[in-house]
Amino acid sequence: MPANTRHRRETKWFPSVWRLCLLAGLCLPLTGCIEDQMTLNLVGYNHTDRSIHRYGVNEYGGGHLQAHRGGGGFTCCISIPRAYKPGMTVTVWGSDWDGKNAIKRVVEVPRYGPDEGGRFAVHFLRGGEVKVFVTMMGLGHPDYPLKGEDAEL
């Protein structure tokens, strides 16, 4: 076998190794994004007179909410930044069975701390307003962020 052919065969793998290293190097910064996220259970509360067939936050679906009910079930999971970012918003969506009363709201997420994660609560309030909270507590707890008439189901 000529020496030139042998050398080519031994170095054939070399470009593949470089491609693999380049791919790994490009993916490395993405691991920082993943580490900066916290995963929360999604929970919904419907304070309105109409059932909500489906609801969700951004691309995460939450299921069905009967009128004047909620908090009884959790959907896994929603990811948000571990560190609060001022002005952070989410898109909350929902619809009834026939889709005629679909809603879509861009809602600002109130300030939260990294130790407050546990639930991402969505409240569909009377009058079409939507509020969200990152909290460890359930509706009815004295320290729950939603107070007064708004907190009534």
Predicted ranges, named:
Residues 42-51:
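Structural motif
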Residues 28-32:
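C-terminal motif of bacterial Sec signal peptides marking the signal peptidase cleavage site
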Residues 3-22:
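Bacterial N-terminal signal peptides that target proteins for export
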Residues 39:
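Short coil/loop residues immediately preceding or within conserved phosphate-binding loops
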Residues 34-36:
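Bacterial signal peptide processing site
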